[in-house]
Amino acid sequence: MKVKVFRVHGYFEKNGRKFKFTKEYRGIKEEDVKELVYSDIGSKHKVKRNKIFIKEIKEIRPEEAEDIVVRRLSLEL
């Protein structure tokens, strides 16, 4: 099993407004990353899972990661 880097695009609804997000995570498969998105967005913004909408999950190369923590963790290996 190899850890990959994924970029996630989506939005969530809170108080009748929509907020876009783009996040980068490390994971083995897309399902793991989807679970991380629900957990992260839900806990930070107090939003239920049914109010979080994921438009796209795309695997990217570690060098393309904009999040410095994700990039450094991926390139150290």
From Swiss-Prot:
Entry's family note:
Belongs to the eukaryotic ribosomal protein eL20 family.
Q: List the disulfide bonds.
A: none
Pfam families per record: Ribosomal_L18A (PF01775)
> What protein name applies here?
Large ribosomal subunit protein eL20
Q: Name one GO cellular component term.
A: ribonucleoprotein complex
- UniProt keyword terms in alphabetical order: Ribonucleoprotein, Ribosomal protein, RNA-binding, rRNA-binding
A biological process from GO: translation
Task: Please list the GO terms describing molecular function.
Answer: large ribosomal subunit rRNA binding; structural constituent of ribosome
**Known InterPro entries for this protein?**
Ribosomal_eL20, Ribosomal_eL20_dom
Instruction: Write down the species.
Output: Pyrococcus furiosus (strain ATCC 43587 / DSM 3638 / JCM 8422 / Vc1)
Describe the subunit structure.
Part of the 50S ribosomal subunit. Binds 23S rRNA.
Q: What is the lineage of its organism?
A: Archaea, Methanobacteriati, Methanobacteriota, Thermococci, Thermococcales
